[in-house]
């Protein structure tokens, strides 16, 4: 028999207050014409440099890699696409580990399948990598980064990862500061490989590394710095607009039980897409994510079951008239929630893209149903579901199935109905991304959640169903995360079912799980590492 929720105290979580308050309200600087002209002049110089570099040459490979890592490749999408296609179509023989690894990574990043057999020349008769390679630090680093583009059953790349990780850890501990640029690059890579790093974070860290590299191109470096600072101004202005919206709602006071994390939500979405053309989409998606966070905390950290039943019904009805059926304290949030989607409809109806909002609403309804399912389990005498049942629900309740669809709504590109239908059917790349976020979140957060009477996590369900220890459950989940990354890599191989820019949104969303959930739940506990990351991307400009 279900326990009476009326007799239960509210499951308050006592989240810490906002780190940022209304700090970004004052960031209203516009990008000047002089800044635009200077960036455009550098851009044309760099474009000419890229086009004139011989096709397939080491010079072109190194240049493209630097552009991508410095965060300016979005300016040269077509030129880079053509260059990588040419490299893939006419591969050149090379026995330089650095160049072979770099070419492999660039080609796979672009969605072309290049066989990992290209690394066989660096192995001995036993299939092990030759010990002589340990003298080539740059080559080891490039092979290490390439190994993160592996898919399932690529044993040579598994061997490559183990081999390079072992030797790079040993080498970096003994490297002198004379090689400081390379030492920093190796240390950073061992902590966070390129494939798993958010593009803005990679740009910020690589600008410093690249500047200290004696072989750097000073024009490209200057361009990257100017572009970073110009984009930062745009992002600050967007966050200023969003902060005004958030302040006007006054939800920090109306919903003190919820995590007040507007800036963190924006940073999350900035990870999904940072380019100027996605400004409208970023603001739309940040509002959706912020309201989702309030709804999530209402389910997890405040409302009773008797309050959540009509609230879930109201979301499923998606009707302003349903507002009278929900508790008074929920009504401002429900109205603001409806208003966000109405605003989307007003903007997109003028562009003939109203169908996008239909799919976004569907995903949000599905997400709230998943929240409610967890509430039902908890209300049913703390029912612990079977692991497989919990997994299917958790892949939805983590939000990583809602975001890929909703983040497309405000984008300028043509996106077909077929693409939205594809997303609705939970494709492998979206399931893999959802699994990564859910597993990482549960590993760092499940013990705290259990202390405040949260529904059993996937960790607890796995331990119960399979008689596993906590450490065994952690090991299983970490292995699942590794395999999910391999599935994401495979889904990028051409021909793809949907445009590459759609897959890139899912990839970047997955990358966002790293800073949010790698060591702790940094969204919930936002005072430490995440605060520093936000500071480096959204406050501190790069010194020219």
Swiss-Prot record:
Function field: Involved in the biosynthesis of germacrene B.
Highest rank taxon of the organism: Eukaryota
The protein, known as: (E,E)-germacrene B synthase
Listed SUPFAM superfamilies: Terpenoid cyclases/Protein prenyltransferases, Terpenoid synthases
InterPro entries assigned to the protein according to its UniProt record, in alphabetical order: Isoprenoid_synthase_dom_sf, Terpene_cyclase-like_1_C, Terpene_cyclase_plant_C1, Terpene_synth_N, Terpene_synth_N_sf, Terpene_synthase-like, Terpene_synthase_metal-bd, Terpenoid_cyclase/PrenylTrfase
PANTHER family assigned: OS04G0344100 PROTEIN-RELATED, SESQUITERPENE SYNTHASE 9
UniProt keyword list: Cytoplasm, Lyase, Magnesium, Manganese, Metal-binding
Residues reported to bind Mg(2+) 2: 296, 300
Residues engaged in binding Mg(2+) 3: 449
Pathway assigned to this chain's UniProt record: Secondary metabolite biosynthesis; terpenoid biosynthesis
Subcellular location: Cytoplasm
Recorded catalytic activity of this chain's protein: (2E,6E)-farnesyl diphosphate = (1E,4E)-germacrene B + diphosphate
């Amino acid at each position: 028999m279900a326990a009476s929720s009326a007799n239960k105290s509210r499951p308050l979580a006592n989240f810490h207050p906002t780190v940022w308050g209304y700090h970004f309200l004052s960031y209203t600087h516009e990008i000047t014409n002089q800044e635009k002209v200077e960036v455009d002049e550098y851009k044309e110089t760099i474009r000419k440099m890229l086009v004139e570099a011989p096709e397939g040459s080491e010079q072109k490979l190194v240049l493209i890699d630097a552009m991508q890592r410095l965060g300016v490749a979005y300016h040269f999408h077509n030129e880079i696409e053509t260059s990588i296609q040419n490299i893939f179509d006419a591969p050149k023989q090379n026995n330089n580990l650095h160049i072979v690894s770099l070419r492999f990574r660039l080609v796979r990043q672009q969605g072309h399948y290049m066989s990992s057999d290209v690394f066989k020349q660096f192995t001995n008769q036993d299939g092990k990598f030759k010990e002589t390679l340990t003298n080539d630090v740059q080559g080891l680093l490039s092979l290490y980064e390439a190994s993160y583009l592996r898919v399932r059953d690529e044993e040579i790349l598994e061997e490559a990862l183990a081999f390079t990780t072992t030797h790079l850890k040993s080498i970096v501990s003994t490297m002198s500061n004379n090689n400081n640029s390379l030492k920093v690059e190796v240390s950073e890579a061992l902590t966070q490989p390129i494939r798993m790093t958010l593009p803005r974070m990679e740009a910020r860290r690589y600008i410093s590394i690249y500047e200290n590299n004696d072989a750097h191109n000073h024009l490209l470096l200057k361009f990257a710095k100017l572009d970073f600072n110009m984009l930062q101004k745009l992002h600050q202005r967007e966050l200023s607009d969003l902060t005004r919206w958030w302040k006007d709602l006054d939800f920090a006071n109306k919903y003190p039980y919820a995590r007040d994390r507007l800036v963190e939500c924006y940073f999350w979405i900035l990870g999904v897409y940072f380019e100027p053309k996605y400004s409208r989409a970023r603001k739309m998606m940040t509002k959706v994510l912020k309201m989702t966070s309030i709804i999530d905390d209402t389910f997890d950290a405040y409302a009773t079951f008797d309050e959540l039943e009509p609230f879930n019904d109201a979301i499923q009805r998606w009707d302003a008239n349903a507002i009278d059926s929900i508790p008074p304290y929920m009504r401002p949030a429900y109205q603001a929630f409806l208003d966000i989607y109405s605003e989307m409809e007003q903007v997109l109806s003028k562009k003939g893209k109203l169908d996008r909002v239909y799919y976004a609403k569907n995903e949000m309804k599905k997400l709230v149903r998943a929240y409610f399912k967890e509430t039902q389990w908890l209300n049913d005498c703390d029912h612990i579901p079977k692991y497989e049942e919990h997994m299917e629900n958790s892949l939805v309740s983590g939000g990583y199935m809602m975001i890929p669809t909703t983040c497309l709504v405000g984008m300028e590109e043509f996106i077909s109905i077929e693409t939205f239908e594809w997303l609705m059917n939970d494709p492998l790349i979206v399931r893999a991304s959802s699994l990564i976020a859910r597993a990482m979140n549960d590993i760092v957060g499940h013990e705290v959640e259990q202390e405040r009477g949260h529904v059993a996590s996937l960790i607890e369900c796995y331990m119960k169903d399979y008689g596993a220890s906590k450490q065994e459950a952690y090991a299983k989940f970490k292995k699942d995360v590794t395999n999910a990354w391999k599935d994401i890599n495979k889904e990028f191989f051409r021909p793809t079912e949907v445009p590459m820019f759609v897959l890139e949104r899912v990839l970047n969303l997955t990358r966002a799980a790293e800073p949010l959930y790698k060591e702790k739940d940094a969204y919930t506990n936002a005072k430490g590492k995440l605060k520093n990351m936000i500071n480096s991307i959204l406050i501190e400009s790069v010194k020219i």
